[in-house]
């Protein structure tokens, strides 16, 4: 493999344009995405999911980026304008927002491939040698330069980034691949009920991460052919990739940690349980996702907030947090916070007990509340004395959503308050 830090890779990234698919709702997140697209969802105390693929682009040296939006995009667009508009267009750097605008058809984006097809004129104007198509709703840290080097080294027409996952986890959830000994893709199945087992890893299958590198001319050919096919759903995983495997050089790039030779960190966070768990992993002493790695920072919009504050140390009340992440603007006023994430501007009032919970921005939790294993959506005001997560039958009766694994989602609408911004 070519040295990922070489000037060679720098030239490859300069010849690359990235298009991030950020128009999905994330329906398995239920009410959490009623008012926002999944890529706009908060994650990790201060970030949004879209910040991860964008940061990967910047850190990899890819500075021509388009973000394709569609479903309830207001909060996503606002975040991109505030946090990702600092590039120098005159130097060929930009993050541009590409909403569905019916360029090539009277329809909005009809699928992942159609979304790229409807922006062919923009790609043509930029004339990149390679086009990287990225999913905008996954959490991971990845050097795309290494994948580009692999793509060129193998002479691939298309390279698909992939990761080894347990078969039971992939069934019905991910596109999976069958590969030969050289990682050439022999078969691609979109969300099969019975994924193909890896020969070298029993119990595991090779799942698509939803990231693709195309040679630009090859991409144009496939998109135009797909657009003319009335039977197609215009989706990369369902239509384009299965159709080109036989007669094209399509490769799988395994996303692995070279130091441990194991699968690298990658989370789909597509369900309430997986979203809650991925956040909870971050409060562990040494989580696999290192948000403190200065060599690979996650960039985001920085709000101007005061430091977090913890007050009261009386016999009957003490404001503190343990095994937790607490963001700027938070005040823990005589309450207990354990194994939880508090996003910005959260106020935990006296005598409150908050445990194993993810609290999104601008939340007020009033006195004597008891909350366990919950996701509290932005802008909620938890009334005094409210108990959440300790009696699931009662939670369900009040209109809260309780997952199969016992995580409770609370939104403003469920509390009878105003709809989220």
Curated annotation (Swiss-Prot):
Protein EC: 2.7.7.27
Any GO BP annotation: glycogen biosynthetic process
Keywords: ATP-binding, Carbohydrate metabolism, Glycogen biosynthesis, Glycogen metabolism, Nucleotide-binding, Nucleotidyltransferase, Transferase
Record-linked CDD domains: ADP_Glucose_PP, LbH_G1P_AT_C
Catalytic activity: alpha-D-glucose 1-phosphate + ATP + H(+) = ADP-alpha-D-glucose + diphosphate
Pathway(s) of this molecule: Glycan biosynthesis; glycogen biosynthesis
GO molecular function, one term: ATP binding
Listed InterPro entries: ADP-Glc_PPase, ADP_Glu_pyroP_CS, GlgC_bac, GlmU/GlgC-like_hexapep, NTP_transferase_dom, Nucleotide-diphossugar_trans, Trimer_LpxA-like_sf
Keyword Ribosomal protein on entry: no
Residues engaged in binding alpha-D-glucose 1-phosphate: 109, 175, 190-191, 208
Subunit-structure text: Homotetramer.
Family: Belongs to the bacterial/plant glucose-1-phosphate adenylyltransferase family.
Annotated function: Involved in the biosynthesis of ADP-glucose, a building block required for the elongation reactions to produce glycogen. Catalyzes the reaction between ATP and alpha-D-glucose 1-phosphate (G1P) to produce pyrophosphate and ADP-Glc.
Protein name: Glucose-1-phosphate adenylyltransferase
Organism in which the protein naturally occurs: Teredinibacter turnerae (strain ATCC 39867 / T7901)
Gene encoding the protein: glgC
